Swiss-Prot record:
Phylogenetic placement of the source organism: Eukaryota, Fungi, Dikarya, Basidiomycota, Agaricomycotina
Ranges for region Linker: 157-202
Cx2C motif 2, short sequence motif: residues: 290-293
Short sequence motif Cx2C motif 1: positions: 279-282
Role this protein plays: Component of the cytosolic iron-sulfur (Fe-S) protein assembly (CIA) machinery required for the maturation of extramitochondrial Fe-S proteins. Part of an electron transfer chain functioning in an early step of cytosolic Fe-S biogenesis, facilitating the de novo assembly of a [4Fe-4S] cluster on the scaffold complex CFD1-NBP35. Electrons are transferred to DRE2 from NADPH via the FAD- and FMN-containing protein TAH18.
UniProt binding sites for [2Fe-2S] cluster: 209, 223, 226, 228
HAMAP family for the chain: Anamorsin
Record's comment describing the protein's domains: The C-terminal domain binds 2 Fe-S clusters but is otherwise mostly in an intrinsically disordered conformation.
Predominant place of localization: cytoplasm
Region of interest (N-terminal SAM-like domain), ranges: 4-156
Protein name: Fe-S cluster assembly protein DRE2
Annotated region (Fe-S binding site A), positions in chain: 209-228
Keyword Mitochondrion: yes
Subunit structure: Monomer. Interacts with TAH18. Interacts with MIA40.
Amino acid sequence: MSPSMPVATTVAADPIAVGAVAVKRPALVIGSLSTAEDGTYQALISDLQSSRQVDRQLLDRLVDNATTLEPSSYDSVHITLAPSDYQGLTQKLPQLLSQLLTGLTPLGTLHLINLTSAVRTLPSELTLAGFNVLSALPDEGTIIAQKPQHVASTSVPLKSRQPGALLNRKKTDPAKKQALWALSSPSTPKIDPEALLTAEDKTRLTPACEPVRSSAPRRKKACKSCSCGLAELEEEERKLGKVVLLDGSQDGTAKEVSQDEKERLIIAAKAAPKATSSCGSCFLGDAFRCAGCPYLGLPAFKPGEKVEIDFGMDDF
C-alpha cells in the first residue's frame, strides 16, 4: 500500500453533545477508480476512521446523479482524485459542488487533495458555488473550503382577514354618498326655467317658406316634344311670375316687376340709341351695370331718356 497523503486536520463543526462526550458527525470520502487502484483512496479512509465514522462514495455516482447526499449530514468532505479526473470534471464541477454544499453542515469543510496546476480556476468555482476558501496551497496540491453559517430562514405567515372584520366596518349611507357628489344641496332654491324666457323667446317664428311635404307627389317637367299641354302651362306660369330688380346705389330700393315688364325693359334698352354699353342694361340700375359703367351710381332711367352727368356731383 502506498504511503498516505497528507490530510488537514479539522475540528468538528457541529458536535452533538451526548452527556459529556462530544460526538462528531460522519465524514465523506470521495474517490475514483484511479485513486482506488493506486491505494490513495483506501489510505485516506483509514486515516479518518481512527477519529470518526467515514462514508465512502465514488465520483461517477455523484456526477451521474446515481446517488444524492442528505442535507447537512457531514462535517467534512474529502475528495482525492487523479489529475486526469480533475481535468474531466471541468464541465460537471458546478453540479458536484452544489451537491457537496447541500450535504455539508454549516461551517463544514471541503478538502480537495492531489490537485494540479491544471485546475487553477477551482478557488473561483468554489466561491461561485457558495463556499468560503480558507486556504489554497498550490505547492502541496490542497485546497480547504468551508460552508458558511447561514441563518435559518423563517417564514412569516400573513394574517388573513377575519370573517368578522368585514362586519365591523362602518357602513356608508347611500344617501350621504350621493349627496357628496351632488352639484346642489336640497336647501338651494329652485329656478323656474319659464321665468328665464322673454316674450320674444316665446313668440312663434313665421316660417319663411312652405313646409316640405314628403308625401306630396313630385311635379314632372315638360319634355322637348311635349304634346300634353304641360309646356304651355309652364310658359304661362313663367309669364305670371315676378322678378325683383335691385338698385345698386347707396339709397337704392328693390322693385318687383313682372316677366313681361322685364322683357319690355330689355327690348327697349336694346332699341335705345343713346343707351350704349356693352351689356345693354345700364338703364335698369346698378344691379345690372358693370364695374366700368359710366352710369354707375345713378338711378335707373327709361330707355331712350337723355341722361346728363353733372361733374359737380364728384367730390374733388
